[in-house]
UniProtKB/Swiss-Prot annotation:
<dbReference type="InterPro" id="IPR025857">
    <property type="entry name" value="MacB_PCD"/>
</dbReference>
<dbReference type="GO" id="GO:0005524">
    <property type="term" value="F:ATP binding"/>
</dbReference>
<keyword id="KW-1003">Cell membrane</keyword>
<dbReference type="GO" id="GO:0022857">
    <property type="term" value="F:transmembrane transporter activity"/>
</dbReference>
<comment type="function">
    <text>Non-canonical ABC transporter that contains transmembrane domains (TMD), which form a pore in the inner membrane, and an ATP-binding domain (NBD), which is responsible for energy generation. Confers resistance against macrolides.</text>
</comment>
<dbReference type="InterPro" id="IPR003439">
    <property type="entry name" value="ABC_transporter-like_ATP-bd"/>
</dbReference>
<keyword id="KW-1133">Transmembrane helix</keyword>
<keyword id="KW-0547">Nucleotide-binding</keyword>
<feature type="domain" description="ABC transporter">
    <location>
        <begin position="4"/>
        <end position="242"/>
    </location>
</feature>
<dbReference type="InterPro" id="IPR017871">
    <property type="entry name" value="ABC_transporter-like_CS"/>
</dbReference>
<keyword id="KW-0812">Transmembrane</keyword>
<dbReference type="InterPro" id="IPR003838">
    <property type="entry name" value="ABC3_permease_C"/>
</dbReference>
<dbReference type="GO" id="GO:0005886">
    <property type="term" value="C:plasma membrane"/>
</dbReference>
<dbReference type="InterPro" id="IPR027417">
    <property type="entry name" value="P-loop_NTPase"/>
</dbReference>
<dbReference type="Pfam" id="PF00005">
    <property type="entry name" value="ABC_tran"/>
</dbReference>
<dbReference type="Pfam" id="PF12704">
    <property type="entry name" value="MacB_PCD"/>
</dbReference>
<keyword id="KW-0067">ATP-binding</keyword>
Amino acid sequence: MSLIECKNINRYFGSGENRVHILKDISLSIEKGDFVAIIGQSGSGKSTLMNILGCLDTAGSGSYRIDGIETAKMQPDELAALRRERFGFIFQRYNLLSSLTARDNVALPAVYMGAGGKERSARADKLLQDLGLASKEGNKPGELSGGQQQRVSIARALMNGGEIIFADEPTGALDTASGKNVMEIIRRLHEAGHTVIMVTHDPDIAANANRVIEIRDGEIISDTSKNPEIPASNVGRIREKASWSFYYDQFVEAFRMSVQAVLAHKMRSLLTMLGIIIGIASVVSVVALGNGSQKKILEDISSIGTNTISIFPGRGFGDRRSGRIKTLTIDDAKIIAKQSYVASATPMTSSGGTLTYRNTDLTASLYGVGEQYFDVRGLKLETGRLFDENDVKEDAQVVVIDQNVKDKLFADSDPLGKTILFRKRPLTVIGVMKKDENAFGNSDVLMLWSPYTTVMHQITGESHTNSITVKIKDNANTQVAEKGLTDLLKARHGTEDFFMNNSDSIRQIVESTTGTMKLLISSIALISLVVGGIGVMNIMLVSVTERTKEIGIRMAIGARRGNILQQFLIEAVLICVIGGLVGVGLSAAVSLVFNHFVTDFPMDISAMSVIGAVACSTGIGIAFGFMPANKAAKLNPIDALAQD
């Protein structure tokens, strides 16, 4: 069985009236160890034939077999495997990647074989040394002469073994001396057992081969052999490794090359990132503002009591009949306090009236409450003491005043121990409350607190309360507790002539409302992210167009479609992730400045918003980078190589 066998190969370019028949029923076979020169004038079809033999192009019709396997039935990645594992290409224009050193250019085919970094470098250095380039390993193509670049190209062709060497006009761009040197290397490769297929238009170059096939106008006009074939030796090559390190090495290499591509166009990369930076900074800042305002509001709610349920007469706030409902009593509060889920229950009654001290009369509100009311509501004492259980039991004529009362009546004196009159009833001041700075407590209303027994028995003369404030135990569910209290009072009153205000419900409403606002504003900020993503896609499409030649080179040396897709996708994600991290940093800087100058509420950047921002930027990189990356992966190798 021949190594290579072609039967009736035809190739056409164009369509319709512009259709050109390039190859016409080409049939040939090539044995292992053969050195074949395909000669012909420009436009004869010789390069097209070599591209088909090297699986860079496909025939329009006919059969092409490698070791008896029909290539027409192979998938793109199977053809890539042939180029990677068995073929080596020597191009007229060298086709080296300008951003890589000689060593990295030579080692590149082994990347797609899964060879480790040390193994790749050692083999590349050995090949360069064998070709007289030991001192040029770190040089880039622009720092090498034409002959040196071609020797690097030859070393690359041998990196994975190069069982079959395809040489396309290998001396076409070289001077005479360099051309002779390259041909000597190719002859040695043939003598070492490599099968060599060379395309040339020069009869003197073709004379180095032991078999010459001449093509004219797409047809073979002669096929002559002058020397017997040399038996093929076992050409060594790196074997593909299907292990986790295989995928890891490929990812690391793709990442490294993506970093090089980003750094190669620093300003363009920065401008591309700008949309992502602004978008991420906007989203993180908006969420931070939402978190800060929500935190401030919830702190204010907590300051007036957490885990509390307030019970009022009537059907709801604004119920005009509530003033006539007198069923909420002290006994209700006592029964409620005995429930297993209740920490405390304090009744409250209130009265408005004239507050008198010496010759000053003021309008104030007096609240009759239990001794636990202050703790439940989170009110703090500034000076003096609060009334206790004994004061409540004894109807003590004591009062705790707020800062407004102190400022109005005792601006220049100590109020403790002083007697004031409320509705002409004497009350002794025993304490002063701190000014309540939360959002719900900034008021000019003059407020006083006395034991509810004192207010009910000595001032209002009523037996019912205006409300009952219930403190729920920390381990109890407030929703369950609310239902239990409702059932209890309905059973006692015989009807539901009351309503409840659950502080946790307020908290949930605030959280829901601020969450909705954050989502709404974030969705607006996300528009800039989408715009940034479109910018990334645009630049990646430009990058694919600019690097089409590079893509063709990588495909020629064995890169799978997945390798090309991965590299360009990593590049897009890298741009977006860097942009995302810079955006988070920018938001953090804005937060520091904001929190320094604004004290009402902070910008609170949470770990989740940072994680979400990075995840979002990664998702944008994948979403908007996939189309350009997929376009690159689907390029035809020969079409990509033809781009300048």
